[in-house]
Curated annotation (Swiss-Prot):
This is Actin cytoskeleton-regulatory complex protein SLA1. The keyword Cell membrane applies. Residues 2-76, 77-142, 367-427 form the SH3 domain. One of its GO terms (molecular function) is identical protein binding. Residues 542-551 have a biased composition (Polar residues). Its main location: membrane. Component of the PAN1 actin cytoskeleton-regulatory complex required for the internalization of endosomes during actin-coupled endocytosis. The complex links the site of endocytosis to the cell membrane-associated actin cytoskeleton. Mediates uptake of external molecules and vacuolar degradation of plasma membrane proteins. Plays a role in the proper organization of the cell membrane-associated actin cytoskeleton and promotes its destabilization. It is found in: Cell membrane; Endosome membrane; Cytoplasm, Cytoskeleton, Actin patch. It comes from Mycosarcoma maydis. Residues 143-185, 325-367, 448-553, 609-667, 736-757, 773-919, 936-979, 1175-1207 are annotated as: Disordered. Component of the PAN1 actin cytoskeleton-regulatory complex. It is a peripheral membrane protein.
Amino acid sequence: MAYVALCKALYDYVAQAEDELNLTEDDHLYILESDDPEWWKAKLRRLDEHGTPIQDDSDDSTVGLVPANYVEEAEPIRLSRALYDYEAQTEEELSMAEDELLRVYESDGVWLLVKKQGNDPLSGGEGRLGYVPANYVDEAEAVDTGAAPAVEDEYTAADEDDEDDDDTDVTGSGAPIPQIHLPQTAQLGKGDNIKMWPVSALDSKKKKKKGTLGIGNASLFFASESDKTPVKKISILHIASHSLEKGKTLHLQLSPEAGLSESTLDFHAGSKDAANDIIRKIEVSKANALTAAAAPVPVPVPAPAPPAAAAAAASAAVPLPPPPPPAPPVASAAALPPPTRTTSATLPPPVRKNVSFQSQPAAEPEEAVEHGVAMYDFEAQGDDELTVTENEHLIILEKENDDWWKVRNDAGQEGVVPASYVEATDASAAAGASSGATAAAALAAQQEEEERLRREEEEAATVAEAERQREAVDRQREARERGEREEKERARREALKAQPVPAPPKLTQRPSTTDVSRAAKNVAIPQGRSAPERPKDGGSRSKPSPTNTRMWTDRTGAFKVEAEFLGFNQGKIRLHKMNGVVIEVAIEKMSNGDIAFLEDITGKKLNPTDEEIAASAARRRERERERQSSRPQSSAVAGMPREDRERERERRKEKEREQRRRESARSGPKRNVDWFEFFLAAGVDVDDCTRYASSFERDKIDETVLADLDPSTLRSIGLREGDIIRVTKFIDKKYRRDKSHSSLSSSRASGRANANTAADLERQIKADEELARKLQEQESSARRGDSVSPAPPQLFSGPDGTLKNNTRRGRPTPKSTSSSNVDAASLAAASESLARTATPPARTATASPAVAPKRTGSSLANGFDDDAWTPRPPSTKPTTPARPTVASPAPSTPAAPAAPPAPTPPPAAVAVASSAPPADPNSALFEKLAAMKAPSASVSPRPGVSPSPGSSFLGQSQMYNPNAPRGPFAPVPANQGLLQPLVPTQGTGQFVPTKTGMMGMQMTGMQPQLTGWGMQGMQGMQPQMTGFNNSMGSMSVMGGMGMQPQATGFGNGNGYGMNGSSPFTGGQISTQQTGLVGMGMQPQATGFNNFGQNAQQMMTQQTGFGMGSQQQGQQLQAEQDEKEKFKASNIFQQMKTGAFAKDPNAAPQSSEKYDALRPQPTGFQPGGVMPQFTGMGFGQSAQQQQQQQQQQYPYNNAYGGGFGGGF
């Protein structure tokens, strides 16, 4: 922080608050802020033992507020001139020009704390304090010779105008007073009153001493109040000269006769008025003393000497009085010289008026008159004296003392003459002598007087001429000496300038401005004080440069502000005011002169044209239309429901918040570059400058990276092609960037791009090589007949055995990674422990080949699946126990021949081990563990396929058994629905017919059922399989099979349970089973007797829910599977196959899981019963009815069938 001034404390001050400083008289202070006229913020200067200012003082107690009237600006050490131009490098330094006069306040040998002197030599300097290099400033005291010729000419002119004026200039610092014998001050100071003023005396070290200054009685005295120094008393006539400095400091120059060790006295008055009063009093007292010194005050002497002027030696123009003639014998005792008179050497002898003796009547003799005769010639020295010649007749008028007598000559003139020059005579002798010589004496006296006057004029002219010549010689000598000094000074400065300009010293020592700024900011501003209001802290605001400010006026002329122009921002000009505040004013509000000034700076026209005014009016009209159109929307919003209004209100609030965020981001901390002005200077259109400036500020671009910007970077920021060229040229011109730099930047960018391309190409070549090697191995294995099973996806390792990076975005990176090696000894111990553990009970399930689940997530190339942390089912499908056979009661009709047992399918083929080395280095250990596990046998019957609906019922029963266990379904991709047809295969490669969802046709092996009344070839009604299938999953407690197919329909009874009462002939009503199977319910006989011709017997039909031991066994088996799922052997097997912690729904599911989605079988029961017609037929064949039925009901019931009956 730069200092405003260096001041010195005038008085002691005790701080009244924590933010104030304690002051002691003569303490030096660095003034930091002086905006407030009554309180200044200052830092106390500390000195070390050698008197050098301490530069590293970081004590906060040295910064605070001080009263402005308790300090004054300190006196400089010297005045010096700058040898070279110097430009300030930091805020604490000061710029200076060559030959500029500087006031030096401090010096540490390397840096000088200075202030510019300015044009007024009596002022305290201009501007602020600052440091300059000591080797850039002349060490010698500056010689100011600029005003010497003017003073010389003025003195010459004044001398020519007043060459005859010999009065002494008592108001200024004139020539010293001639040495004369002074009378007593008591006599000189009569009538001179004493006046006193409170002042401070300054010693040789510029220390102040309070006291009282008094002037009067032809004396000047000073009484100190701070010490016991005796009162100094000086004659007013010993003050040779006096001057006033800075309006308050009185400088007195004393003559050697003062008898003091100091030749000068300095007093500091409290105000300018008091200083002026002191000057006037000195001049008045000095004039009174000089007048009193010239008064005829006789001084008695014991031995009178010849009369002589006391100051005859001071000037050659005053002649010495003639020596007295020898005393006559008769009057030897009276022949004494006159006493010494105290006269002023600067006053000329009085001019006597020519008095005509004829005009003066002769004094009539009186008897009481005493006559005398002049014994010597006497020249009058004062106005009251009388000039007499030897032997002149005189009349003695008074004898007031023994030294001087008052006489009258024959011409009637009166005056005083020395008593020793006059001899008294008697009256008769005087009368006789005077009667004859009166006329001759009068004529001789007149001639003598005229001669004396002429002689005096000639002598005065001679003296004046000699004085002028002497002064001219003195002036020439002074001019010559001054020229020699200036020549020597010029030669010395030229010699210094001829040397190379030294480098500025390093900033090794400098006042700790950081501590000063911090301490200054911590100063609190007290409130409610009786003392003056404290200045506000303005340290955080930077002030504009005074050289760049100007007066700005608005269009009305009512407001004016002095500020510095910073640039444009969104159609407004930015101004930096003198108090540090930055404001923005619209251009159209500025006066025409300011707009013209801005146009000269920017080179663009800123006054709006007619087209722009019309466009602005059109925009205003458009905005008005938009506001009017938005009003119906507001009314529409008011008519919305409450929920819609709330949503609309939230939407508006979110828009407002977003607008505020943008405004806060736009009004954030400003960077040191005004990008708007930058683009404007580059020639970019004003409308685009704002957008480009916001882009640069958003991307944190500053001046340090401007030289490295290339067209591609500017294009990515959003600049247009033409603006890119303009900005590039402007950057090259402003920062002197040559073409080689641009080419080097482009070459670097292209080199980086080429390097990246080469690295990508190398990686791609390696990946292609690896892929080609794998394809070659697969092709070779295929030619050899080997089946190579792809390596299962690993959770923690990749295909090459390296650990995967299982970290994903959003999860913390693990601090340490586990080793990729597996301890074989630990696995062997685990294997033995598993071998000793009891083998779990074997489970019977439908045998199906193990199908590796297909990866549906991200590829292994990504290193980690997106769903790696979701639960997953085990890789091997748990075996399902065989469903227990539910025994059904024998029907009353002859039973059909039993179906032969289903053929045992061949065992599943074991995958041939690949000849290629295992992809996972731990696969061998996991295979050993899998080999120790007991294999579970599974048997799956192969359902047959009926080629046509006309096959025998026996074949149908062998080909399809609805109660038999079903094979597993094919795996379902994650992105497909569950109701797609699942077609798994057995080891033989043949398809197993599985049905899920709603089918458009009936299952293989099931006969079409005809409904209605058949008129021709009507056969007995076939049994219908009805019941509810568990499709919703909520009835899984009843078992995976849901409701068993139940047989309903007509039996062979006689009509409605009565034999022989039906018009139809046929068998009897067969026993029908209703109720819950396995719950102890007895079968109920329902239905009709056969009522048509050629009707065959109806087989036993089963109805009801099957919830016997089969469902209980399924529940127990599910619980046992859930317990064994988390055993160590199963977990190791899952980790080996890559199915650990995967979604159970993504793996192949159990065959019973989707039974709810299978269509319920309807058709023939074993026994060879033919299809039956129900209802009334109208000549249509059974096949036509079957087709109609299939067209009318293309889908099965959601519950897998419905109710089958004859009604």
